[in-house]
């Protein structure tokens, strides 16, 4: 389990319900949990040479310092703006990027069964992974398609100078 620390303190936000009263205090969520699960033991410990020989992805993209930081069970990452993204519950692309780099190789395929605004697809593309996304809400399908297309355009456009 990874604890995503979204904010430190209340940052001026107020949890209405019974402000400054014991009648009905509402807790303000400053963290969320990311559950890491696998069927059986999570083990992709085939040697690089065996993976390469069998045509399987084998290249890591994670920096050693990032690996050490990201294998801690708390990640402090600022939340994403719902208004800016256009989705009521967006998360920053940094969250799936870290998970993708920790648990997959370059060239692997990432599955996102709840695509929402497309953050995981964008993170997968930026880290050299393939992705498959699913979303039931047609509005979010259109949003994700637009955001992925914009990310592809930015990804393919060389920086000036």
Q: What does each model-found stretch correspond to?
A:
Residues 145-161:
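S-adenosyl-L-methionine
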């Amino acid at each position: 389990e990874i604890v995503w620390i979204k904010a430190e303190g209340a940052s001026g936000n107020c949890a209405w319900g019974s402000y400054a009263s014991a009648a009905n205090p509402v807790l303000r969520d400053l963290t969320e949990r990311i559950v890491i699960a696998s069927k059986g033991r999570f083990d992709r410990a085939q040697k690089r040479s065996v993976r390469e020989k069998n045509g399987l992805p084998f290249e890591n993209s994670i920096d050693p310092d990032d690996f050490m930081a990201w294998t801690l069970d708390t990640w402090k990452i600022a939340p994403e703006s719902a208004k800016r993204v256009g989705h009521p519950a967006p998360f920053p692309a940094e969250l799936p990027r870290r998970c993708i780099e920790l648990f997959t190789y370059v060239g692997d395929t990432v599955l996102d069964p709840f695509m929402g605004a497309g953050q995981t697809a964008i993170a997968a593309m930026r880290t050299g992974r393939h992705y498959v996304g699913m979303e039931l809400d047609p509005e979010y399908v259109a949003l994700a398609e637009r955001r992925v297309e914009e990310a592809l355009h930015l990804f393919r456009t060389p920086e000036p100078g």
